[in-house]
């Protein structure tokens, strides 16, 4: 899109995203559903040997198992779910631990938890991640970049994207820091980059007189204190189970002091506003630019969303979000419902079809990630 028509479309998109204005006069409000959430709690922790940090960073993940393949796979048993949701923690000094978890449901009317007896918990080719016309929008200007929701997107020193989900926490894709066997080179000194204005000499601050002297944006980096990666990714990376658990949480050494976006349980695709998802990331083909896009969900499984949002390596780890009505508070709210993972070529009725894939935040994954953030399951009762 170029020229005046393209500019007008871009301005309309930014108005809808930034000002929370809907381009459609819908007579109903898509509402965040209420879920009865499980509880994922640590049971035992084991110290592990220090890992090698020699894996090459992969900025995308590919799989030949598409929607029909995944739909034909049975949901994990209770014991399998516990194995997949157990997790590895890496600390800044290079030490690591493995934590086994239990899965519970909260007894009605009680503040205690009880054990849950059961839980339903291609072919090589050039990867095409741009579909038809490139529908991505580079976001320029500090008035947009430094304000919500775009300000929640951050860059990882390994080359991926992450999203601020709490005062000190960043959600990203597991493959950005771990290849399924060991940690990516540079993970021990992992940093998270925040866009901020770069001023010419003698300028500074956010007042109007100095804002005219803004030269460009730059990254300010904060070190990561520890990371959590589910064992479903580590155990399952050799097969298509791993794709379902391609997410990780990073804890920063200090608060970032920005507005963040909460996580939420992913509703069924038919309940999403317009059937669409949104995400912003640092695609490698537009270095230094934050790139926003939105598109329709084409298909879904219990753990994955299949879509054809235009994306390039570097966007992996972006938080996939939607904006829906929160009935108790009587307000609109955006929530992260998934993590952009990568690209798939799949066989659809004998014809090759490619998708970009996002990992859905299911009730179990929500309980796990929320506990990583809060450290108290009682604070994780609302998805």
Swiss-Prot record:
What protein name applies here? Answer: Serine protease 23
Record keywords, A-Z: Disulfide bond, Glycoprotein, Hydrolase, Protease, Secreted, Serine protease, Signal
Listed disulfide bonds for this chain? Answer: 160-176
Q: What is the annotated signal peptide range for this record?
A: 1-23
Positions annotated with a glycan in the UniProt record:
93, 207
Q: What InterPro entries does the record tag this protein with?
A: Glutamyl_endopeptidase, Peptidase_S1_PA, Peptidase_S1_PA_chymotrypsin, Trypsin_dom, TRYPSIN_HIS
EC number(s) on record?
3.4.21.-
GO biological process assignments:
proteolysis
Record GO cellular component, one term = extracellular region
User: Where is it mostly found?
Assistant: secreted
| Organism name | Rattus norvegicus
Residues at the catalytic site: 175, 240, 316
Name the family the entry cites. Answer: Belongs to the peptidase S1 family.
| Superkingdom to which the source organism belongs | Eukaryota
Subcellular location per UniProt equals: Secreted
Q: What class does this enzyme belong to in the EC scheme? A: hydrolase
GO MF annotations for this entry? Answer: serine-type endopeptidase activity
């Amino acid at each position: 899109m170029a020229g005046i028509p393209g500019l007008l479309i871009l301005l309309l998109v930014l108005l809808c995203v930034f000002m929370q204005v809907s381009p459609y006069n819908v007579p109903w409000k898509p509402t965040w559903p209420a879920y009865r959430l499980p509880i994922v709690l640590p049971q035992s922790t084991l110290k592990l040997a220090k890992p090698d940090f020699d894996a090459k960073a992969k900025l995308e993940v590919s799989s030949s198992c598409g929607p029909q393949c995944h739909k034909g796979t049975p949901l994990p048993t209770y014991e399998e779910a516990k194995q997949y949701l157990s997790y590895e923690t890496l600390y800044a000094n290079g030490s690591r631990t493995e934590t086994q978890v239990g899965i519970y449901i909260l007894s009605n009317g009680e503040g205690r938890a009880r054990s849950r007896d059961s839980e339903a918990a291609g072919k090589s080719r050039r990867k095409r991640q741009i579909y038809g016309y490139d529908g991505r929008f580079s976001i320029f200007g500090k008035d947009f970049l430094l304000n919500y929701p775009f300000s929640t997107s951050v860059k990882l020193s390994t080359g991926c994207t992450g999203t601020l989900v709490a005062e000190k926490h960043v959600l990203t894709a597991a493959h950005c820091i771990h290849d399924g066997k060991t940690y990516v080179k540079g993970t021990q000194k992992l940093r998270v980059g925040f866009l901020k204005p770069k001023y010419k000499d003698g300028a500074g601050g956010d007042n109007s007189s100095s804002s005219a002297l803004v030269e460009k944006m730059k990254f300010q980096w904060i070190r990561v204190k520890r990371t959590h990666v589910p064992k479903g990714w580590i155990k399952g990376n050799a097969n298509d189970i791993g794709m379902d658990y391609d997410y990780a949480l990073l804890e920063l050494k200090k608060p970032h002091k920005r507005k963040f976006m909460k996580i939420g349980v992913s509703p069924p695709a038919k309940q999403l506003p317009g059937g669409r998802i949104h995400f912003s990331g640092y695609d490698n083909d537009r270095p230094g630019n934050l790139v926003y896009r939105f598109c329709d969900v084409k298909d879904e499984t219990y753990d994955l969303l299949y879509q054809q949002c235009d994306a390039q390596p570097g966007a992996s780890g972006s938080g996939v979000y939607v904006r829906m009505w929160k009935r108790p508070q009587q307000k609109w709210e955006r929530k992260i419902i998934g993590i952009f993972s990568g690209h798939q070529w799949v066989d659809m009725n004998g014809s090759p079809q490619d998708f970009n894939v996002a990992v859905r935040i299911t009730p179990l994954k929500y309980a796990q990630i929320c506990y990583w953030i809060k450290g108290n399951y009682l604070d994780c009762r609302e998805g």
